[in-house]
C-alpha cells in the first residue's frame, strides 16, 4: 500500500484523445516521483478540466514548437518531429501561423489522436507543477499489458 501511495498510482483512461497508443478504459501505472518531463513522455495533468488529462509531452523548456500547416505535422526547433504513434493529421487549431517558445517550468502537450484532443493548442502551455506523474505501464486490458512506449 505504501508503494502505491508514495511511488505510483493507478489511473484510468477516459476518452479517445490518446488513441491508438491508449484506449478508453485502459488502466495505467503512473509514477508520481518528482522528475523533469522529457519529449515523448505520456503524463497526467491535473488543473485544466474537472478530470485529469492524459497527454504526450511534445515540447520542453527551451524548445520552439510550431505546427506546419501544409504538412500537418509538428516542428520542434525547426525540425519535423518523428511521431510514429500518430495516425491522423495535426491541425493547428488555435496555433495557426504561430510559433510557441517554451519557457522554463512549462511543457507543450498534445494528444495522440489530434482530431479529438483538448491540449496545448487550445489550453496553452502546461506548468510542470500541474503534472501528476508519468504513465509508465499498462495493466489493463490483459491483452495489451506492458509498456506504453514504442521500442526504438
Label for each model-derived stretch:
Residues 1-3:
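Single-pass alpha-helical transmembrane signal-anchor segments
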Residues 6-12, 19-152:
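Soluble "head" domains of membrane/secretory-pathway proteins
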